[in-house]
């Protein structure tokens, strides 16, 4: 494409050195002159957008903030679509139309930062980050979430809560069938699922998210990565400070035998009777409902699901184990797709200072701890993983945090991600349905993605 930027790389240490040196003066200035304030004499009104929150913790967080900042700032929680793709479309329509009043603070997917920043839709908050979090900004957060907020050597968001794909399994049923540990490979998962479904009369062996949407993209990527395949050179492990951060990658690698093998393994779950045919239309709530009702042995899910086990279902937390995702062959590294949400400030917000005050509040240790305990939302602050009060109380916090640090892998880091995602969603789903072969799928995607971002 005509405005494509060449790929650039820098190590985390170089990123810190360049960022710290370039912002030395900015740090002294702090947030002065970095955004507008309230209009008139009343409180500044801040509109905050996010999807539905069944845990109730988000509305409680907003209510707490409003009580503590009464007369100064008032935050309105605007509920958006629960479907990530639809939420993204709603936001981009507002950005392009210059909607008024604008959404001031966006609770956004970790993958949106580069595209929003490249289009000038969100505020560069680098000065604010260094002023309020000290020159060692990345050390305050888990490496994967803070990396997701960076683009073009700047910070565009604050990590709010984080996610990574987990394998939930019926620990009680595996033990009853003679298995002492979770599967390490997909073949082991099939073997265990086949035996447990027969022994315990469970309907399905494995449920996951295979529908034609962003969740289906995430699941397809995990199958590809865990077979040794890749999509873009920017699909890197983001927890190693000595490995490069790819600012704008453009080398397409999906058209490989390893990528095809990953999609074949995904399809084989249906062909071998481990997963139901209906999984081609499953989203998070469908797979969660099946597992929570006792109808599945294994579930590929997110950390927040742990808090739901036992609520209006037959499975309680004591029956559930948590493991990393299986791989194609024993000894291969396991990767989980980095999920989670950042807080971005609209570049057209008339109340940037007030918006920043809310962002800092919502991402502060007290609020992250509250949402971790009440909703199993994984914190982004490293210090909270040493807080035994929440680690001991919510087991998924420690296990999920370890997986994020060791196994988290980002989706393609590129300003063209929305275009790439739509192609991946359609083709991954067609492969899962058996409408195209895995080989045809990856060859098709190789050509399409080269046209978009190559």
Where in this protein do the model-derived segments appear?
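Extracytoplasmic/periplasmic solute-binding protein
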Residues: 147, 151-160, 165, 190-250, ...
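Short helix-initiation/N-cap motifs at beta->coil->alpha
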Residues: 79-90, 186-191, 278-292
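Conserved N-terminal structural module of periplasmic/extracytoplasmic solute-binding proteins
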Residues: 2-121, 130-139, 181, 314, ...
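Hinge/lid segment of periplasmic solute-binding proteins
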Residues: 99, 110-164, 219, 223-226, ...
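A structural signal for short loop-to-beta-strand junctions that line the ligand-binding cleft
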Residues: 93, 101-104, 134-174, 204, ...
């Amino acid at each position: 494409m005509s405005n494509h930027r060449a790929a650039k790389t820098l190590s985390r240490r170089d990123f810190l050195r360049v960022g710290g040196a370039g912002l030395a003066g900015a740090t002294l200035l702090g947030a002065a002159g970095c955004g507008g304030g309230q209009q008139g004499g009343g409180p500044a009104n801040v509109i905050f957008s996010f999807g539905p929150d069944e845990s109730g913790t988000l509305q409680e967080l907003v209510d707490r903030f409003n009580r503590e900042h009464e007369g100064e700032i008032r935050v309105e929680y605007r509920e958006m679509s629960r479907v990530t793709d639809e939420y993204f479309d709603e936001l981009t329509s507002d950005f392009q139309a210059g909607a008024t009043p604008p959404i001031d603070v966006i609770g956004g997917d970790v993958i949106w930062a580069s595209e929003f920043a490249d289009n000038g839709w969100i505020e560069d908050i680098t000065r604010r980050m260094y002023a309020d979090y000290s020159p060692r900004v990345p050390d305050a957060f888990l490496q994967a979430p803070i990396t997701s907020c960076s683009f073009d050597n700047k910070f565009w968001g604050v990590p709010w809560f984080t996610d990574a794909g987990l394998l939930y399994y019926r620990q009680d049923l595996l033990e009853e069938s003679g298995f002492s540990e979770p599967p390490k490979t997909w073949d082991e998962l099939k073997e265990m699922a086949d035996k447990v479904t027969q022994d315990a009369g469970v309907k399905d062996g494995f449920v996951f998210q295979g529908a034609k949407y962003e969740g289906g993209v995430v699941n397809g990527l995990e199958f590809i990565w865990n077979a040794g395949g890749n999509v873009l050179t920017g699909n890197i492990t983001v927890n190693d400070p000595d490995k490069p951060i790819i600012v704008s990658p453009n080398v397409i690698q999906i058209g490989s035998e390893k990528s095809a093998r990953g999609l074949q393994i995904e399809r084989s779950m249906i062909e071998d009777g481990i997963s139901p045919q209906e999984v081609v239309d499953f989203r998070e709530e469908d797979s969660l409902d099946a597992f929570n009702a006792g109808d599945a042995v294994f579930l590929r899910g997110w950390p927040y699901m742990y808090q739901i086990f036992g609520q209006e279902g037959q499975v309680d937390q004591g029956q559930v184990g948590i493991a990393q995702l299986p791989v194609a062959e024993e000894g291969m590294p396991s990767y989980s797709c980095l999920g989670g949400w950042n807080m971005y400030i609209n570049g057209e917000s008339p109340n940037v200072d007030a918006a920043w005050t809310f962002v800092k509040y919502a991402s502060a240790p007290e609020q992250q701890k509250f949402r971790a305990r009440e909703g199993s939302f994984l914190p982004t602050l490293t210090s909270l993983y040493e807080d035994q009060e929440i680690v001991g109380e919510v087991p998924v916090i420690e296990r999920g945090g370890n997986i994020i640090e060791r196994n988290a892998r980002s989706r393609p880091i590129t300003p063209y991600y929305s275009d790439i995602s739509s192609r991946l969603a359609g083709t991954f789903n067609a492969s899962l349905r058996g409408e195209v072969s895995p080989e045809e799928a990856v060859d098709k995607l190789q050509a399409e993605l080269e046209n978009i971002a190559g």
